[in-house]
Amino acid sequence: ISCSLVGSEMCIRDRSWKKSCSGFQSSKEALLMWKKYKTTLILTTLISLFPMVIGLLLWNRMPDTIATHFGTNNVPNGWSSKTMAVIGIPLLLAALQIFTAGFTFSDPKRQNIGPKMIRLVLWIIPVTSLIICCSIYANAVGIAVDIGFVSNGIVGLLFILIGNYMPKCKQNYTTGIKVPWTLHSQENWNRTHRLAGWVWIIGGVAMIVNSFLQLEWILFLTIAALVLIPIGYSFLLFKKGI
C-alpha cells in the first residue's frame, strides 16, 4: 500500500511537472511572438493613435459635439463630445489593438495562424482607425465625406482579404470559423474554410456594391450569410461523420 501511495504521488508530481513545463513553454512562445512582431505592433499602435494628432490640429475648427455614428444616407444618429471623438476613440482603438495582439499571440495554436494572417490582424484596426476617424473629423469641419461609402468599402475589402486567406488557414482559436466541429476535425475545418473563403469574397463584393447603394438589408443579409452559411455547412459535415 505504501509503495502504491508513493507511486501515485510520483505520478501526480510528474503530471504537474509536465503541465508546468507545458505552460512555461507556451508562455515562452507567446513572448517570442511579442518580440517577433514588436516593431509592427508599435507602428500599428502609433497609427491607431495618429488620428488624435490630426484631431488636435483641427481642434479649434470643430464643434463641441461631433457626429460619430451615421445611419443610411449619411444621416448622423450618434454624437460624442469633441474630447471623446479626438482623444477617447483613438485611445480605445489603440488599447483594442494591443488586446487583439495579445489575444492572437496567446493562442495555443498560434503556429497555425501564419505570418500573413497575423499581419492582417495587426493592420485591421489602425487602417480602420485612420480612415474612419479622419472621415469623422472632415465632416465635423464641414468637408462632406460619404461615411456610408467609406465604411462599406472598407468592410468589403476586408471581407475579400479574409476570404482570400481562409482556405489557407489552419486550425486555431483566433481566426476562422471556430465551432466545435471544425476545431475537432481537420477535414471539417479544411472543407468549411474552402467554402467560407468564397462566401466571404462574394460578401465583400456585395459590401463594395452596397457602398454605392447603402441599403441596410444588404448589410444585414451579407453578414448573416457570412456567419450562417459556413457554420451550417460545417454542421452538415459533422452529421456526415466528417
Q: Language-model segments: which ranges?
A:
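Membrane-water interface of transmembrane alpha-helices
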Residues: L57-L58, A95-S106, L161-G176
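Terminal transmembrane helical module of multi-pass membrane proteins
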Residues: Y173-K240
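Active-site and channel-lining beta-strand-loop segments
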Residues: G55-I87, T175-H184
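Ordered, amphipathic secondary-structure segments that act as subunit-interaction surfaces
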Residues: T100-F149
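Single conserved hydrophobic/aromatic residue that forms the stacking wall/gate
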Residues: I1-D14
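Alpha-helical transmembrane segments
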Residues: G78-L93, D146-I162
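Select subsegments of transmembrane alpha-helices in polytopic membrane proteins
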Residues: L43, I87-L92, R119-P126, N190-I201
